[in-house]
């Protein structure tokens, strides 16, 4: 039913239709800023206040995504009802609605489920006194249940269980398998029928050698991937072929490219036949490239064409590696062999689920997942045929609710959808379900939201609604200026499609201008691209600073410009411009690890900033000390917590005093040593007094803890130690006190759980830390203050800001999950590697590969939607900030797609994206503003789009100019003071005598620096030949005052070259040497080292995988792999006379102990060889390349290699046949 829109209505036609349409299920696709909440509220108000047949507000079920949204909606409805009451003061119906509003069903779906459980608990034998468990409490119960289950399974001793254990555990423990069981269980809970879903994915492995791979349920995704890769290879070769036709192009190579294309086309013709591809893909051979010589050929075009052809080769090699290293029969056999293992896993998960549920019922608790599943159980009943159908309870709600309205429908999951279908009445064409959402803003896949539910209805429903539901598009944006909308549309028309993005960004999806802003020429979207290449000749400070600091400096610079200009923002309520304030600005990040550094930089530049950090609480010193006190109370025989407490302000012992305690008893636990000190100590001794007071408190607290709650104990500790008062007097005291109060509050919350006691509380906290569930530092600053906001993109959803900075666009997407040995998918189930514990081999099965490809598309689609949410938060000005290693290379990479005539960029190019810049860059390369900069003409229809961009290419060292100017200004002030005869500022005025004393040096200093035990690296540094390329210089006295310089902790940031070298060495130490590793295998090695905490995240990101793999393709790499004996990281100690190392030493015959670690030794038929890896920068550092570098590098490292050789020959009694240095940069080998 449609009601005509009044002539004076301010609603758009689409909004009006969304407000008044009835009679069927309605899906409203509401774009960002389109006023969907206002439409939703207006629809409810009109139903409640209609003059004919009004309904009561409690006959509406309104489902929101958050409690805050529900509260806001109730508030808006109350305001509207109160206004209506002013117009109709005698209306009893309106007064009734105001009284009913508080108990109206306007809430999250979890809250509605809770209502259902409280009303119908008896239908499922649920204890009516149940409570909702804390997440950590639930996990602790689950851990206990899992431990008991595994103990029982081990006791049974069944072969099937041990087969499972052998495949998914390490030699040391079975925690990996326990984690797998819990993960599969929790994932299954996103399905309406978890057990049925678990049992269904066994069918993936229910095959025989006669099965057709093409008919298996996962093959659709294998087929799509093969087609995409082949088309991607073809696209590269077509681009290369086009280059041969260009002026100066490599025309002789045309025949090569045509032959290559013919082979690719042959594969494309058979891309649906896996068996045929198994025969054909390995047989593809790219012929030797024809020579291109002569001045008429452009070397740049030749290089570009060569790179494109090499790229196509790599794609085919990857295709072969992924799918065709094993025959179809071998693939099927692997699946069949894994089937019994998967069946055992499924039964183990089901057993765990039943035990876990029983344990929770015993304690009368439920979790959020139980809320939905118990509600679903209440709303369904089994009929005579054994089928599930709506129960009496469901029919009650169907009659109760006149309409069910769902906000943020794109974030609904399968269980929630099932519940909604059970409380609504009728099929889609006559239903009463009203859904509002925007699939382009579905960014909660990690919470198992299912955007395909929205998409399937959007494709099925029609604008007329005939025979099905009705869809209504709200695409007018009332939030942002035209420049913001144009920029967003320009990017997403090229990036978002059905395969990657999961929605076509067509005319219906485009944002249309709905807001009326006065003209402003300064609102174009700005891209700040920061080049922090390490091989630049910039200062060491520029090389040392991390990417985050450069971006923070760039942001701070732009904020200062906005505030000082000042930039004008439009106040819509007052209909006038005003000066921008800090509170008008937000900085958005994908995640918060960068937040502390950005806040530090902004504050250093005088910019107030606020972030609601969700981490850092447990690292706060005052919290760590308080937890150490509790650990000591629980068990004083814990040395580290006890030392922490003694060193803290609570006791106040210094390092020397801690040593005195340890000397009292060197072998006993530290607690015993402390008691011995007290027993033997001098009662007038200050340390004795400190320890005696603490010991008395400790005994009191231990006794107190036995009869009081943990929260009472914490408060007793605060009171006895006055620690709360102490931290209040420290810098940031208000924040520190708030942190201590949070710990007390957390203890009180813990006491409402099923657990009791101090030991359990400490385990409770440890569990939170293991899970990464940091409490976040307590809020001590109001969000209403005039400060710049810093938040995640997810936190910003639903908010708007006049000026938005989207930072960290060069950070890699988190694809870690794709590297696991197993994956879970709602549609396909469980994909795993084939694992043979006896043969110690494993490799991906086809279901695992299919899921990996499918999930990569889904992850990229999610990242596109996250980017869309970020861009659409801006009202007036948008800044995009990202960093790269070399912007010229980056531009060249982006230009590859510039000549495309279709709006949507090629699927394969988008599939390769690893960062937001990989999305944004190629799209911007086709815009006139960046296209001119890149030097590549784009298609006129695309480059002529009205979007306006301002692109800045910034070198990292340019961002340090402000600091340099500040230092120069300070120096000028000192010189001016001297000229005027005035005192030099105090921090630089030195008494001559003090200067003389501080500058005194010991006359025989060189003798003191020769230690009896030295490392090879120390000896090398002292004897090494210094050169202009080494990047080092001999130590010399500082000229002028050392206080003129910044302290080291402010200078040094990020990984040094040595630290990066160490990371590369770590990989070379652990990478398998049985065969030439692939890129993927090397990446897996790096990932494994990171998981084992042998590499930090920063080191992992610094490793150049291609440089690692390149080594194994060299002659020396081949020798190493084929060697009959090899060993790595070999430590040695060797005593040598000092004169052999330092010819001028005073004590020439004094023995020195030389220690070192040899990177690699290997033995071939010829003899023993010594190999050392080097991470020196070679390319671009020497005028004549490696030829010029060789003698310098040989001189630099000859001492080190001589000592290594001497050590091997003396210790192993074997002559070293040869020595070599391998330089990762450029893949150069230097024999010595």
Swiss-Prot record:
Family indicated by similarity: Belongs to the helicase family. AddA subfamily.
Organism, as annotated: Bacillus subtilis (strain 168)
Classification lineage: Bacteria, Bacillati, Bacillota, Bacilli, Bacillales
Entry's EC annotation: 3.1.-.-, 5.6.2.4
Protein name (database record): ATP-dependent helicase/nuclease subunit A
Reaction catalysed by this enzyme: Couples ATP hydrolysis with the unwinding of duplex DNA by translocating in the 3'-5' direction; ATP + H2O = ADP + phosphate + H(+)
Annotated function: An essential component of the DNA double-stranded break repair machinery, the heterodimer acts both as a highly processive, ATP-dependent DNA helicase and an ATP-dependent, dual-direction single-stranded exonuclease. Recognizes the B.subtilis Chi site (5'-AGCGG-3') which transforms the enzyme from a helicase which degrades both DNA strands to one with only 5' -> 3' exonuclease activity. This generates a double-stranded DNA with a protruding 3'-terminated single-stranded tail suitable for the initiation of homologous recombination (Chi fragment).
All residue ranges annotated as the UvrD-like helicase ATP-binding domain in the record: 9-481
Subunit comment: Heterodimer of AddA and AddB.
Example of a GO biological process term: recombinational repair
Binding annotation for ATP: 15, 35-37, 76, 478-479, 541, 573, 873
